[in-house]
Amino acid sequence: MTMSTTAVTTDEYRPTGRPTHRVEVYGADGARRILRPARPADVRAIAELVRPYAERRVLVAKDLISYFEDIQEFIVAEEVPGGVGGAGGETPSPAVPRIVGCGALHVMWDDIAEVRTLAVQPDALGTGLGSAVLRELIAQARQMGLKRVFCLTFEEPFFGSHGFEPIEGTPVGADVFSEMLRSHDDGLAEFLDLARVKPNTLGNARMLLHL
């Protein structure tokens, strides 16, 4: 059973007055989950979700303040009551909503962004949730008029299944490269393949999706 996604319209509003974009998904485990923009109140749940991956150096470890500063880049997958259970109906819905997945889209230039901090709870692995989060981030990139999406990952087969291809070097011209060098963002330094961040990228695949 593959995860299905259905966009739903809500009357929920962010502090800016703009309505949130929410996508309702049902996974292979029958759980009902909502993909939505992250809020500051989600930061600690995101940090706790990422922590075991960061401890294994699968994802970059970040201070709590970094999540607050970047929260507008994140979407979360929130598991909510109302799921249908697993194949045998034995998987209960949570009594209260919980964050079971996250991902971020960081714009690096006028035509390119990076997928960052894509993670799901261990008990949601294999349900299609990671793919649903990634598809939503790619959809956001398209809506913003971006042409390419970059990722730095150990999960080459997963991203490859979504159209990402391995790359060598830095896929920008010299003028853009020199402008990007002005940034203090480590993720952008990894995109540029700078020597100072090489220890952080060992074993990772550099991949690019053309939209």
Question: Model-flagged regions — what are they?
Answer:
Residues T2-T10, T16, A87, T91, ...:
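Ala/Thr-enriched low-complexity intrinsically disordered regions
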Residues V58-I75, E79-V80, G101-V120:
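A conserved beta-strand-loop-helix scaffold within acyl/acetyltransferase catalytic domains
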Residues V172-L211:
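C-terminal "cap" of GNAT-fold acetyltransferases
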Residues Y53-A54, I167-G169, D185:
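Short, hinge-like loop/turn segments at secondary-structure boundaries
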Residues V120, G126-A139, F150-C151:
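Conserved acetyl-CoA-binding loop-helix of GNAT-fold acetyltransferases
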Residues V8, R14-V60, E78, R98, ...:
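Short amphipathic alpha-helix that is part of the acyltransferase structural core
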Residues Q143, K147, T153-L181:
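Conserved active-site alpha-helix within GNAT-family acetyltransferase domains
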